[in-house]
Amino acid sequence: MSKQIRHRKIKEILLSSTVTNQHELILLLEKRGIDVAQATLSRDCSELGVLRSRTASGYRLMIPEDNPGQMIKGLVEMEIQSIESNESSIVIKTLPGRAHGVGSFIDHLKNPGILGTIAGDDTVLVIPSSVHDIRSILDYMQTNLLNN
């Protein structure tokens, strides 16, 4: 089964059904003749921008329809509490349990000045490609992670 077909089926299911978690999505895909490992489904959901959103009846997996990048940026903005730096790195403090999502968002921005991120529970360590780029990375983060 090609990734393209799997992605299309995932979109169809999420747009037509209330799906509360990935396990349920796997079962719905299996009913449609698509066998997929949980790790593969997790990657597919990430690539499609699938969000787990709270609704009046509980949680639901959803595909954002209007400008998903802007929607995710809005969520990231709400999760960041502070951004600080020293002469060698940048530390982002987030709401508890949200550092992984913020770190992943930063990684997906693919800024060449950022070597990578390491996320804990409420802290993201941003490692610059060069310590000489700290100021420009901070400016970049102000523009791309926070409300201006």
UniProtKB/Swiss-Prot annotation:
Major location, coarse class? cytoplasm
Q: MF terms per GO, please?
A: arginine binding; DNA binding; DNA-binding transcription factor activity
User: What does the record give as its pathway?
Assistant: Amino-acid biosynthesis; L-arginine biosynthesis [regulation]
Q: Name one Pfam family in it.
A: Arg_repressor_C
Name its GO BP terms in alphabetical order: L-arginine biosynthetic process; protein complex oligomerization; regulation of arginine biosynthetic process
- Give TM regions: none
Localization, per the record, is: Cytoplasm
Query: What cellular component terms from Gene Ontology apply here?
Result: cytoplasm
Ordered alphabetically, the record's keywords are: Amino-acid biosynthesis, Arginine biosynthesis, Cytoplasm, DNA-binding, Repressor, Transcription, Transcription regulation
- What does the UniProt record say this protein does? Regulates arginine biosynthesis genes.
What the record says about family reads: Belongs to the ArgR family.
Query: What's the protein here called?
Result: Arginine repressor
The organism encoding this protein is Chlorobium phaeobacteroides (strain BS1)
